[in-house]
Swiss-Prot record:
Residues 1-229 are annotated as: Pyrophosphorylase. HAMAP family: GlmU. Transmembrane segments: none annotated. In the N-terminal section; belongs to the N-acetylglucosamine-1-phosphate uridyltransferase family. In the C-terminal section; belongs to the transferase hexapeptide repeat family. This is Bifunctional protein GlmU. InterPro entries: Bifunctional_GlmU, GlmU-like, GlmU_C_LbH, Hexapep, Hexapep_transf_CS, MobA-like_NTP_Trfase, Nucleotide-diphossugar_trans, Trimer_LpxA-like_sf. It holds the Pfam family Hexapep. It is found in: Cytoplasm. The keyword Transferase applies. GO terms for cellular component: cytoplasm; membrane. The keyword Cell wall biogenesis/degradation applies. It comes from the Bacteria. Residues 251-456 are annotated as: N-acetyltransferase.
Length: 456
């Protein structure tokens, strides 16, 4: 077992031709974040001293997307094989550290497997991650003598006998910095592909008398790479199935685990119920006894105890205290805050607005840049007119206010406590406590009125 410090190299220079996309392959998302970010996160969780990212195609987009402080960007201008990629990073290796080699398009590698690989690496030798496949066609085969790993033969260079070997190379390995630099300097491209294979260092290490220890991953999906969108979609479902299983075992009721997506992290209380086709993105917190209806999307939000979110509601960057009810078809945009027992009904939109304790906005309403007190009733069709074409302005509504249907509050405006606003009113001035306000035009009756007749 090695006790050395460790750095990680992530190979991410491939074009991803089979993705048929202008986006670099490793930036295609799995569970809401780029594939390569999953690998970077694993490296950081392992406590890597540095992460060397070998890039080529789409370097500008990679730099715009990835903002890790400890990333060292290494350019591979020509893609001449995995060994060539590692040669570009080699000048940054310290002799006394271990180097772990990972891939930006193998997103589900687990920290636990990598910890076992690191622990298994012999002093002066190599730790190698391998798997056995029923059909190993196309993969490099692991050769052994008396049970000991002696080398890796790529499929195109393998003999018929070697092609019968089922144990294959995943490409993930760990070796000492000084040894790795020495072996990389000896690589040649005398092979069927005309490339520099990192796998050739296995035979070099064996010839020098160093031990190579093979470790198997916990699950095959951990080492599955992505070369096309079909493979990416399959890994997405594998990942989501794993997350759903963990949540079910932790006490979350998923009505259909196959129709649930977690694209971030979820902290949850007890007796949480989640219906079908729900998507959770970013960092989501659900309190005890929260119920989420079918088709909801919740992103970067905290939902308090006993809240119920009815179907097809969207909640983003919002905060809900206990016992709030939302939807169906409600939209809470960034900055929405509901205090205890508040209700937002169907086709109500909130942004940068706070709804007080026990207050209700039941139907067809827009509340933006607003502070609304406790026990307020917002009638159907109410709009806070917060934008004058250049700037946003605030609406403040006190406690115990009744706002009638089809009311427009033209900000900036303040409504005092206990105010009653009649239906159809346009509020343009501040209102003192306990006033009744109405601004309707006189109702006109025209007897004997005849509707226009359509011309034929």
């Amino acid at each position: 077992m090695s006790n050395s410090a460790m750095s990680v190299v992530i190979l991410a220079a491939g074009k991803g031709t089979r993705m048929y996309s202008d986006l670099p392959k490793v930036l295609h998302t799995l569970a809401g974040k780029p594939m390569v970010q999953h690998v970077i996160d694993a490296a950081n969780d392992l406590g890597a001293c540095a992460v060397h990212l070998v890039y080529g195609h789409g370097g500008d987009l990679l730099r715009q997307t990835l903002h890790e402080d400890n990333l060292n960007w290494v350019l591979q201008a020509e893609q001449l094989g995995t060994g060539h990629a590692m040669q570009q990073a080699a000048p940054f290796f310290n002799d006394d550290e271990d180097i772990l080699m990972l891939y930006g398009d193998v997103p589900l590698i687990s920290v636990e497997t990598l910890q076992r690989l690191r622990a298994a690496k012999p002093q002066g030798g190599i730790g190698l991650l391998t798997v056995k496949l029923d059909d190993p066609t196309g993969y490099g085969r692991i050769t052994r003598e008396n049970g000991q790993v002696t080398g890796i033969v790529e499929h195109k260079d393998a003999s018929e006998a070697q092609r019968q070997i089922q144990e294959i190379n995943t490409g993930i390995l760990i070796a000492g910095g000084a040894d790795l630099k020495r072996w990389l300097a000896k690589l040649t491209n005398n092979n069927a592909q005309g490339e520099y294979y990192i796998t050739d260092i296995i035979a070099m290490a064996h010839q020098e008398g160093h031990q190579i220890v093979a470790v198997h991953p916990q699950r095959l999906s951990e080492v599955e790479g992505v070369n096309n969108r079909l493979q990416l979609a399959r890994l997405e479902r594998v990942y989501q199935a794993e997350q759903a299983e963990k949540l079910l075992l932790a006490g979350v009721m998923l009505r259909d685990p196959a129709r649930f997506d977690l694209r971030g992290t979820l902290q949850h209380g007890r007796d949480v119920e989640i219906d079908t086709n729900v998507i959770l993105e970013g960092n989501v917190v659900l309190g005890d006894r929260v119920k989420i209806g079918a088709g909801c999307v919740i992103k970067n939000s905290t939902i308090g105890d006993d809240c119920e979110i009815s179907p097809y509601s969207v909640v983003e960057d919002a905060q809900l205290q206990a016992a709030c009810t939302i939807g169906p078809f409600a939209r809470l945009r960034p900055g929405a805050e509901l205090l205890e027992g508040a209700h937002v009904g169907n086709f109500v939109e909130m942004k940068k607005a706070r709804l007080g304790k026990g207050s209700k906005a039941g139907h067809l309403t827009y509340l933006g840049d607003a502070e609304i007190g406790d026990n307020v009733n917002i009638g159907a069709g109410t709009i806070t007119c917060n934008y004058d074409g250049a700037n946003k302005h605030k609406t403040i509504i006190g406690d115990d206010v009744f706002v009638g249907s089809d009311t427009q509050l033209v900000a900036p405006v303040t409504v005092g406590n206990g105010v009653t606003i009649a239906a159809g009113t346009t509020v343009t001035r501040n209102i003192a406590d306990n006033e009744l306000v109405l601004s309707r035009v006189p109702q006109v009756h025209k007897q004997g009125w005849q509707r226009p007749v359509k011309k034929k």
